[in-house]
Amino acid sequence: DLFGKELAVLFQLEVDGKAVCVSDDAMEATQCGPIRQNDLQQGEVYDARLKGELTGWHGVRTAPNTLHLIGMNTVPIREQEAFAGRLCRTPNGETVLDFGQNMAGYVEMKLTAHEGQKICLLCGETLDENGNFTQENFQDRNRHKEGGTAQLLELICKEGENHYKPSFTIMGFRYAKVETDIDLTGAEFTAHAVYSEMPVTGSFGCGNADVSQLVQNSVWSQKGNFCDIPTDCPTRERAGWTGDMGVFIETGLTLMDCYPVVEKWLAECRLNQYPDGRMANIAPPTSRPGYMTTMLCMSAGWGDAAILVPYALYKRTGDRKILADNYEMMQKWYAFLLGRAQQTTEEQQTGEYAQYTVLNGLDYGEWCEPG
């Protein structure tokens, strides 16, 4: 319900060659449609009874325009593979949909219901040791989000046939727990994997089924974590950790053409570099900086992505522009690390590479599991 005085976009909507809507300076009213709640990670609440022509428009609240807008510099995000859901019953008596593949995406529903009936899907990646639905593997309660990560889709039905899929949310899942009093006879549930458009560039197969499966797991891990930016997981944090990308970039380029996605992400890294050369461990930032944020932004391994990732892109493509775009960032990070190394005391300096060895400051250490 926010609106400013400066128009940034002019548009004309045409249907069958006829203009049905033209923007002007009077865009000063708003109305709420069927999407009642939405969050990119938490999920969506959709009231199908409100779908259709909107009435009762009301005024908007004006907000100051302080942002510099630029054109989109990424590849499209698409629905990719689709998987039909299989209804099953857990030992606890829960009704659960099994889509047969862990992915990042959402569920499309087709069902018949009475007006006002609800169906809720809670999405999760695995079943627990007893075969019951769980989200415990990715919950951290209030550390990142109050109450944890819901991964909830709720549909409030209209009378008769209902066809729904979310518009602005994706989640990591293979299973979905169903909560409803609707008769699901004849209902259809389809899971759509959603990720950036990246052509497959490599494949692998061998006589060892476990090794082949490991590679396939890596492929699906990439698909589940390359939705506009590379992230660490599609469920809990879903953050652009530099350390993860620094480790995965060579594999990612081998499996899929992720160059455009990573190129865009590097721009976020440049924007979030500190003046003294330290690198933000997460780009773009996902929350307000805490007291540990600035201290850990000198971490070797994580910040090294500033050099490792652009260089990997250059080696794979020969594109010197990626080096030109990121050279200043690379140089500043190198200078910062060299400065840390030169603070090492004479007593600590041993070996041929002593002058390049960092033994001071705060880094992610052995207490942090590998990314």
Residue ranges and their predicted role:
Residues K264-A267, A280, A324-Q331:
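Beta-strand segments within the central parallel beta-sheet cores of soluble alpha/beta enzyme folds
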